[in-house]
């Protein structure tokens, strides 16, 4: 019986010899257009790696950022960092040259980690939404409900997608029933094909259910935040007002940041889940160029997350500033109050301009 790999190798589609005996689908992208793609993709990869590395270092270094919420945020940044290191460079070569230079086995490994890391981001965002919901809805029992054990169990649950996608892609379960489509693929292409059962399961459990839960959680959080703000204003007196408002503002700052990140995530990922599901149902009609464009929408989500942290969360913004300015190397800033960091030193103006360039001119909240 012919294997799926042999089916691709015996493709009857007219392919072109692209580079050094690699046979790929014809690509009418001009050299000028290819240069533009490279000029866009390389900075995106660099920002993804640098920004998420900055997030990881910030959480590991500054004590104020070492909260249970940020344990989940740390793993989200690690997942995004791995997307920049392991996924985007190889996908960039495929996008620019419309060819896969690394063999069929590595194509499956690449798809495995691509889906694993992206699904991991979805699940981590869902866990962070639950954490924020508990912090706002039940603040007095937050530390009883969100314990170290709870965080460990949530992380374990999220990482279960690693062996799941490993079995699916390495055993080619996602390609069962797609022999006809595979026969039309060139030998050195790396197709991202999902049969209907896997596409539906991936969409429902990797998109629809988490996004519904996140939307409901943040909708409820918004209602509770407004109620708490009114209650504090009407019941607190004198210095108690400032203290209560300060505590509430810090919780809301983290919640607003994660809410924005979830909103951006849904916007960037929805096209992929819609197209992948409809393609599986009605047949694969979208061009390889369209697929690459949609895939890069999902990768860009890993690029923008650290930018959103810096733009909408003052502690993270100040942490990035202290790292880029080099102040963490001159004296101990591990215990600094990241809500109140002075930016006035002349030595640090270059770093301040660097941060401003990266995140734009955002006013402190």
Swiss-Prot record:
Tissues in which the protein is found: Specifically expressed in neurons of the olfactory epithelium.
Region feature (Extracellular Loop 2 (ECL2)): 175-187
Molecular functions (GO terms): trace-amine receptor activity
Record-level GO cellular component terms: plasma membrane
GO annotation terms (biological process): G protein-coupled receptor signaling pathway
Domain comment in the entry: In addition to the well known disulfide bond common to G-protein coupled receptor 1 family, trace amine-associated receptors (TAARs) contain an unique disulfide bond (Cys-24-Cys-186) connecting the N-terminus to the extracellular Loop 2 (ECL2), which is required for agonist-induced receptor activation.
Protein name: Trace amine-associated receptor 365
Organism from which the protein derives: Petromyzon marinus
């Amino acid at each position: 019986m012919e294997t799926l790999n042999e089916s691709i190798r015996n493709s009857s589609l007219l392919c072109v010899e692209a580079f050094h005996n690699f046979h790929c689908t014809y690509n009418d992208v001009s050299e000028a257009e290819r240069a533009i793609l490279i000029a866009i993709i390389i900075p995106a990869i660099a920002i993804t790696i640098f920004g998420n590395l900055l997030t990881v270092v910030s959480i590991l270094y500054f004590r104020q950022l070492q909260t249970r919420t940020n344990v989940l945020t740390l793993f989200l940044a690690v997942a995004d960092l791995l997307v920049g290191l392991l996924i985007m460079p190889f996908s960039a070569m495929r996008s620019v040259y419309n060819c896969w230079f690394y063999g069929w086995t590595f194509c499956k490994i690449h798809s495995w980690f691509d889906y694993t890391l992206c699904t991991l981001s979805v699940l981590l965002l869902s866990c962070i939404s639950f954490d924020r919901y508990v912090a706002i809805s039940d603040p007095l029992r937050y530390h009883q409900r969100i314990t170290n054990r709870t965080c460990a169990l949530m992380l374990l649950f999220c990482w279960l997608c690693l062996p799941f996608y490993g079995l699916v892609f390495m055993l080619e379960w996602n390609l069962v029933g797609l022999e006809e489509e595979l026969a039309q693929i060139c030998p050195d292409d790396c197709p991202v094909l999902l049969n209907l059962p896997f596409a539906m399961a991936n969409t429902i459990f990797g998109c629809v259910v988490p996004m519904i839960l996140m939307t409901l959680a943040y909708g409820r959080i918004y209602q509770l935040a407004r109620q708490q703000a009114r209650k504090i204003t009407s019941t607190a007196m004198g210095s108690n007002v400032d203290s209560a408002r300060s505590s509430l503002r810090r919780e809301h700052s983290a919640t607003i940041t994660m809410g924005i990140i979830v909103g951006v995530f849904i916007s960037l990922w929805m096209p992929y889940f819609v197209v992948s599901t409809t393609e599986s149902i009605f047949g694969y009609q979208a061009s390889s160029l369209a697929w690459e464009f949609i895939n890069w929408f999902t990768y860009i989500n890993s690029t923008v997350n650290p930018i959103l942290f810096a733009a909408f969360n003052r502690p993270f913004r100040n942490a990035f500033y202290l790292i880029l300015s080099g102040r963490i190397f001159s004296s101990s800033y591990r215990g600094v109050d990241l809500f109140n960091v002075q930016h006035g030193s002349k030595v640090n103006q270059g770093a301040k301009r660097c941060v401003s360039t990266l995140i734009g001119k955002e006013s402190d909240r």
